[in-house]
Amino acid sequence: MKKEKTPPLSKNIIRLASLNIPGGGQITVEDGLAFVGHMDAPNGTSIIDVKDPSNPRILKQIFLDDELSHTHKVRVAGNIMITNVEQAQRHLLRRGEKLPDVSKQLALSLGRPPNDAEIAAALGLPENKLTDVRRFLNDGYNDGGFRVWDISDPSKPELLSYVRTHGFGVHRFDMDENYAYISTEMEGYVGNILVIYDLADPKKPIEVSRWHMPGQHIAAGEKPSWKGYKNRLHHALRIDNELWAAVWNAGFQVIDVTDIRKPKTIASHNYHPPFPEPTHTALPCEQLIDGRRIAVVVDEEHEHTPGQLHAFLWIFDVTDPKKIQALSTFNVSETESPWSQCKGRFGAHQFREKIDGTLVYVTWFSGGLRVVDIANPFLPKEVAHYIPPAPEQFPSPQ
């Protein structure tokens, strides 16, 4: 273990150990094992024994065959593990689909063929990414979906099936021992929708139903009232017979899955605009607080515009699904992290997707882990935090 040049900043949290592994997009911990979905190829998934938290031990690392995809999300139920397969650099490459038209327009306006610097500037892309864009336009992308693994022996995960979906492929998702609740693009729809798969035979997952917002199913004649794919499913989390769906710039919705074959929307709440950052996760607490059903919602920070709010945490009263009411918010000031002005994102991102008490464990990009007590839902209070130092060759912790 290396001695860090800059120590972590901490209150009421003690770090027991660390591992020098590539960054992850999701960590799932089950029965003393940590499953890490890595952000970038060739790193796929790491399975780590954390039964002794002071001495974590890597059991297995799964690597990817190419750099076209990343598998940065992972979940586990029993002896089954699911990893997503999503197009790497997806937003950048989707923007690059305009390259042929932009090149023609530039040629007409300039009176000559444009050079790469001019094309990249018109697309709003780094010039060194045009090679990737041209490869994508030539080859397309057909690998998006999810993989199902048998982890009876976590040191030797066995691939059981690979389900291909469409477009970008699969982003975040939820699962239990019966079903997978997948957020993915699908042919005929704009933006990610919910597709539910039966896992009774993990070697052959079977689609049982779909859910989307009105306006997404363009193949059926629906017309979105928004531009692009800004309104879409980020992911949905199951609690009892409900799925709590964060739908990006459309806020959050609650889906009844009492009949798994006919999911239906029973509640929705949208606070966009005026709040600029999209809704990342929504989830109710497992117990009532002062007789109220409370839900926690977090937005995800993107490129920050000065003068606008950073992404933050919301607390809602959802006792009456027809009258959802915001009770409070929790914010982290730029003054509370030495990396808030460094390159990279600062604001909120995600919380632990299980709220079994009044403590919410929520992360800020360069603002670190914040432990927030919502025992008084009108006045959330931070009780602990931990900000790791920036990794080598990175300007800030993310």
Regions found by a protein language model. Give the residues of each.
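Short, amphipathic alpha-helical "recognition" segments used to contact nucleic acids or chromatin
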Residues: L99-G111
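Feature marking well-ordered beta-strand scaffolds used for ligand recognition
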Residues: M1-D101, I119-Q398
